[in-house]
Structure formats: C-alpha cells, structure tokens
Amino acid sequence: MAKHRYLPMTEQDEKEMLDVIGVKSIDDLFQDIPEKIRFKRDYDLKPAKSEPALLRELSKLASKNANTAEYASFLGAGVYSHYIPTVVDHVISRSEFYTAYTPYQPEISQGELQAIFEFQTMIAELTGMDLANSSMYDGGTALAEAAMLASGHTKRKKILISGAVHPESSNVLKTYATGQHIEVEVIPEIDGKTDMDALKKALSEDIAGFVVQYPNFYGQVEPLAELEKLIHENNSLLLVSSNPLSLGLLTPPGEFGADIVVGDSQVFGIPESFGGPHCGFFAVTNKLMRKVPGRLVGETVDENGKRGYVLTLQAREQHIRRDKATSNICSNQALNALASSVAMATLGKTGLIEMAKQNLDKSHYAKQKFRENGFEVLFSDGFFNEFVVKLSKPIKEVNESLLDEGIIGGYDLGFYDTKYEKHMLVAVTEMRTKEEIDAFVASLEGVK
C-alpha cells in the first residue's frame, strides 16, 4: 500500500528503486547536505481547509493587490494596461491551442501552425520587415538575441546601445554579451534621446550594430532616418526595439531601413501579470532570414495541392544542430503569441490605428494638463504614450500616497539613474478616461 496519499509508490516500490541505485535509504540521497543544516523539524502547517474556505482565504489575500481593474494605472515603462478583447481568453483556452510549445508534427497541428503564421505575418506588416519569427521569450531577450545575430553576421565583437533604451533590456544584453565575449558600449542620452555626437565618435570598423528604442524608454521618438544613415555608412546593422502598438501611427522601422526589429507584443492581448510571461517578437530583412533565432512557420502545399503550414528552415535550430544553432531558444511563447494574434485580428487594421490614436491623444492631453497646472514636464519633442514629469518629492513616497486614492502612479526613473531622481515616467493608454487623468493631475498638486 502507498505510504503517501498523493504518491502511488508502495514501500516495496521504494525498496526496489533504492536497491537498483545502490543506496539503503532516502536519507542516503541527501548525504551531500551537511547534517547541521538539514531541516529536521515538523512542518508548521495549518490544518487542512475545505475548498470553499481555501478559496475565501486566497481571495482575501489577492484583494490586497492593487490591480488595474479597480485602480487607474499610469504605470508603463515596458508593461502596459491595455484593453484585452474578451474573445482572446476564449480562443486561447481551447484545448487545441492551450500550450506554450511549438508543434513539431504539422500533420496534426495545422490550426496552431496557421495561428503562428498569422502572428508572424502581422508582426512583419506592422514593423515593415520582410519576415518575423514565431516569438521570443520577451522584448528584452529578443533585443539581446538581435545583438548576437548582428555580431555573428558582421563577425564583429562590439555593440553600441543607446542610453535611452530600457535599462532592463540593456542589462539583459550585457548578460548575453558576457558569455559571447562581446563588448557593449552605452551611448549616453541627452534631452531624452540618443546623443548623436557621442554616437558618431563611438562608431568604428569593429562595431557590429547599434541598438535604439523607438519610441524610447523616455517616450521620445528617435530620429531613425538620421540613425540609419550613420549606422549603414559604418557597415553596421541598425537594431530597433519598438512598441508594436505605436507602429499603428508611427512610420515602421523597416521603412527607415532597419535590419532587425524586436519588441514585446504584451500590448496586444496579454495582461501585465506582474511583469510576465509576455511575448517577444523578432523581425528581419530577407538577407538575415537564415540567421533568425527561434521557430519559423512557413506556408506550403501538400502532395494534393492543398495549402499547409510547417516549421521551416529548421537546420538553424538547436533541436537539429545544438552546437551550431543560431540560438538556443527552445520552448517559446506560442500561447501568448496566439493571444496577440487574436487581439490584433479582433482589432483589425482600423481598430489598431484607433487604439494607437487614443493612446496618443490621451497622453498628449495629460501632458498638456500637467503643464497648465504648473508642473515641469521634460522634453519638448514628439512622443507616443509616455512622458516625464519632475516632482518635488521622491516618487516612491508619491506613489504610496496615490494608492490611497485608487491610482497606480508612474515609474520611478531614479531607480536606474540618479540623474532622474524625483522624476516620474507617466504612461497613458486607451484605458484611461478624462476624469481619471484630471484626478491624477489634481492628486499630484502638492508635489509639483
């Protein structure tokens, strides 16, 4: 009979397994752990609860969280509060789709493969690039993989990255680069954008590529046309990290001549979820097609002439040639990519443009409201849905007081750069109403 309620193994099973591996007891398996640090007391667990009692307790705990269903959120910095069409959860909950894994058997996975193909197609169209892959883990790892591709393609070992790129993405790149012995140099930002003079001085024949964010971490729209000319004159690659929603209004990076465009599709159908899991995307020009990391789904025809979808160019991947793979990305974000596909398809081209326009209009209204009320708003150039406001108190204190008023405040820029202490990065999406924006500005009146 089994010793444990939830483990079907009997004492005889246990004895036979221990005999096979040559140990006498379960304790022998942990002999490498010093005796003095082993946990030997009984677990101080509370008595078991019934399911309804447990649900009540967990609901009570969950209610302590500040959530965007009950609070007006002005927090962005890479993760945003956007409307998720109700059909998204319905579709991704279907058993045929409910997996984060890539389908290796096309004969029984046509639905999922087509959904991934649609994701690739929509991302390629939004970014203005020739093709996109099936997804990456998130925007930060997509950016790092783009830099690795640039280094491998150009056979150069140095990457330049704008200081106006999200600092967390920049840190992910530095982590990747360490293992590959690639040097990363940060080009400072000035007035919320890349310092062009510093970039010109840093360019040399050992530069594989330059990474820029569009719109950038401070919400500003970088001059991609000018950057493209500079970078390509140096025979380096232009790598652009972009918010895909902004591309409903902004000129796509591909039209400026970007070589690689990456980002995170969290803005389409994926909840904030305390920072993840989300869904990175990776789009390139045709010349880089065979060096793309991750899965690629292609359209073909079977022996009867019927349309079909398959994983293509698989020789690039680690499950085929691990030591020579373009990347070691494995199980990807297929389920979240599906969520983004459903959200984009539901919005359609007109709806996506309208959603982007609402972000633009509402954020510009908020910025104007701050200025009218005497706040110092940094940077005067164009932006999409984020801007920077200077306050008189530490942002952490301000945000704690805002929670009492049902408001989730903006991002504390001083967290990564002391130059921006007491500066708040404010994000305004289509979810915010005029009344909420007005209340937010009024709540900050005492700290301007």
Swiss-Prot record:
The keyword Transmembrane helix does not apply. It holds the Pfam family GDC-P. GO terms for molecular function: glycine dehydrogenase (decarboxylating) activity. GO terms for biological process: glycine decarboxylation via glycine cleavage system; nucleoside metabolic process. It catalyses: N(6)-[(R)-lipoyl]-L-lysyl-[glycine-cleavage complex H protein] + glycine + H(+) = N(6)-[(R)-S(8)-aminomethyldihydrolipoyl]-L-lysyl-[glycine-cleavage complex H protein] + CO2. InterPro entries: GcvPA, GDC-P_N, GDC_P, PyrdxlP-dep_Trfase, PyrdxlP-dep_Trfase_major, PyrdxlP-dep_Trfase_small. Its EC number is 1.4.4.2. Keywords: Oxidoreductase. NCBIfam families: PRK00451.1. The glycine cleavage system catalyzes the degradation of glycine. The P protein binds the alpha-amino group of glycine through its pyridoxal phosphate cofactor; CO(2) is released and the remaining methylamine moiety is then transferred to the lipoamide cofactor of the H protein. The glycine cleavage system is composed of four proteins: P, T, L and H. In this organism, the P 'protein' is a heterodimer of two subunits. Belongs to the GcvP family. N-terminal subunit subfamily. This is Probable glycine dehydrogenase (decarboxylating) subunit 1. It comes from Listeria welshimeri serovar 6b (strain ATCC 35897 / DSM 20650 / CCUG 15529 / CIP 8149 / NCTC 11857 / SLCC 5334 / V8).
